[in-house]
């Protein structure tokens, strides 16, 4: 595992040096977060077992003809569905366990919602990568055992990242490393036989694919999830802590947005475009909530202009949470979003709307227009507080009339009390929220404050007050926005750089096996020139020179001279090696690039145990409505993320099947765009 800078030429990877290995958290440490993640992993296994049982029972019910057997299967199926519902509720309880992720400092604040990390299974890269190194690169695969072990160690460390910037760098370094691995070992025309399995963070349903893009997308999701955990951990009683929380949630939104735009068809609910859009909105809403807390942190002075600003800031938070709750209530997100999340979002929407009306009431009731006050400025602020004044009222007349100010202020208090009552009611309807004591305390204190304020100014003729408080225009001094991930700031060394420069020695290109060329320089003349950077190519080859007669060809890449690896050497360095050879001649190994084979997407085998239709499945099902019945029958047999047909698939070659000299691979028509490459923001499919 490494996080070192990429040198100009490959250097020995010093494992003893500081910073080479970047480890995750101790998986055996009994912290609150690790216990929660272990419970999530155990629940995922139980959900997998239950889903398999349900799938088997449904299949048996389809083929069974005996009446008693069918009745027994229906009974068992009802039990399995009941178990699945209970497991889903347990997983929802883990997703709303916000107390574990909050700051250790005691704070009287509304809790924030973090995302849990996606769980995965162990993967053994060694056999597949060793076979490919021998088959494709014609090198001794045992020379790369340490590099393969480093890759597997890095992946294992990413399962338990630390909840800080080092943990984010760890995940990002693995994501970048996956780009190197994809280019080196995953040709677009075949599958490598490595099954990647990841569990849905929201439903616990496992999804498996023989495709590295599932791994990359899941790592991106975990980067966003880790940012949310960092944001909830920040101390919200300090200015620096709130700044860190705002930044973390904006970065989480940026990572999830990048995931949505890059991986457009994903086989799990938590990474579907609709769900990711909602999660991005949720992160931005929580960032906006922290902006409001930053304004209130020094204390809210009971001044007219300060109260106008705070009221509009609170209205902004309430507005974004109201929009988020509307998005959560739409299909297909509604069926899979945790109910406790939607309830908490609804509670916050009413809570901050109530605060906005409370501050508006305070500025109207507690402040009178005094002689010498900035009358024009107050009139302008009051007119900008509403999109329209209540019927029969004008800003200036309201400011000058104490009776109108009190009547309008009390109407704001009535709306504030109504919103508080609704937030308390919503919180009481959700069992998970009832167990969050700090949330209940915040809601009850705010409700009591508004109720007492109204009771102080309540008159007997309030029933005759027909003024209806208008909505408050939302406004903020700091509009939150997504911060896209900056992978360029976290560079990593390619573990397999000994294979050669990635621009030439990649899985997309094929060469002849290395050929030994033994020749002598006649009177210091090699018979050819050199060109290129790394690796160096044979250029302007004299067909009658000793090298050409020994088998060298125009355009050959020089990979070694006198058993010295030359794949990373420049022209001047290779020329020094050639001139240093004595009278015994030059022993040189070269490879020839075969005809370029156009890349074609491999057919992606998706395995999802009894998973219901995802967002992507629903979209593709709609696209198929206009097709014929015959086409529909054929399409059902294929993966919904298929690339190409069976006849275009290239059978995986054996370890002993080395590329033959001079035999070019047939041209394959390119049907789809190239798959997602490293740091490429273009849209792509699995």
Swiss-Prot record:
Keyword Cytoplasm: yes
Domain PDZ intervals: 515-593
GO biological process, one term: signal transduction
Major subcellular location class: cytoplasm
Region feature Interaction with Rho, mapped onto this chain: 46-66
Domain called BRO1: residue spans: 111-460
Family from the record: Belongs to the RHPN family.
Protein's recorded name: Rhophilin-2
Organism: Canis lupus familiaris
Protein encoded by which gene: RHPN2
